[in-house]
């Protein structure tokens, strides 16, 4: 998840009280950003995540090395990810060639719902970021790290509620729509 903003409100919000919701000012001071690379272990729901100052191939390679350490052995690791350029850099491709147990699967454009870690990002946003006040990137990263630790104490796997057929149909519909907009883009 790139460009997570460390936002500080210009004034304190009013707390919730009987008959009124809590409030926040609409304006804010932006104190920088962080990038979170995260991997969701599907069976148990555990999340491995690391914050980085930037979202380049160098940081992504560091994260891949972390995953290689976290999941030792020769068991294949299937990574589902978006089409961000960082994931396709020549140095990343070279590293993947030397580490063939890493199998990358790229979701189609505008299909982030296919990537289960996006559900976890939603939880992170709802519970640790959205209404937060972060006076620095360090404060933001500390909040993300605390959420990761709390989540991993009692991880819950995300479970698909859609059927395989409905997912395949959504993908087909997505491809048809993309082909209408930009012929040849899905081949």
Which positions does each model-derived feature cover?
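Short, solvent-exposed loop/turn segments at secondary-structure junctions
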Residues: 2-4, 42-44, 84-86, 110-112, ...
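Short coil/turn segments at beta-strand junctions that form active-site/ligand-binding loops
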Residues: 74-76
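C-terminal domain-tail junction helix/linker
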Residues: 139-187
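Acidic, metal-coordinating catalytic cores used for nucleic-acid/nucleotide bond scission
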Residues: 55-56, 79-90, 109-114, 139
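Active-site proximal helix-loop segment of RNase H-like, two-metal nucleases, encompassing DDE(D)
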Residues: 47, 117-139, 150-152
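Extended, low-complexity cationic-aromatic segments
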Residues: 1-65, 171, 175-181
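RNase H-like polynucleotidyl transferase catalytic core
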Residues: 20-28, 96-116, 132-134
């Amino acid at each position: 998840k790139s460009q997570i903003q460390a936002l500080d409100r210009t004034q304190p919000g009013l707390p919730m009280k009987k008959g009124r919701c809590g409030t926040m000012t609409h304006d804010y001071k932006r104190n920088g950003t962080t990038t979170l690379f995260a991997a969701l272990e599907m069976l148990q729901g555990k999340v491995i995540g690391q914050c980085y100052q930037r979202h380049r191939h160098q940081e992504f390679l560091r994260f891949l090395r972390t995953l290689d350490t976290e999941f030792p052995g020769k068991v294949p690791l299937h990574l589902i990810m978006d089409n961000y350029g960082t994931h396709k850099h020549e140095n990343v491709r070279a590293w993947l060639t030397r580490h063939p147990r890493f199998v990358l699967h790229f979701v189609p454009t505008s299909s982030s719902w296919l990537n289960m870690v996006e559900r976890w990002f939603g939880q992170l946003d709802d519970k640790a970021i959205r209404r937060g006040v972060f006076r620095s990137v360090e404060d933001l990263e500390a909040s993300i790290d605390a959420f990761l630790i709390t989540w991993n104490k009692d991880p819950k796997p995300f479970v698909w509620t859609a059927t395989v057929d409905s997912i395949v149909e959504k993908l087909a519909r997505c491809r048809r729509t993309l082909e209408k907009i930009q012929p040849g883009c899905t081949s």
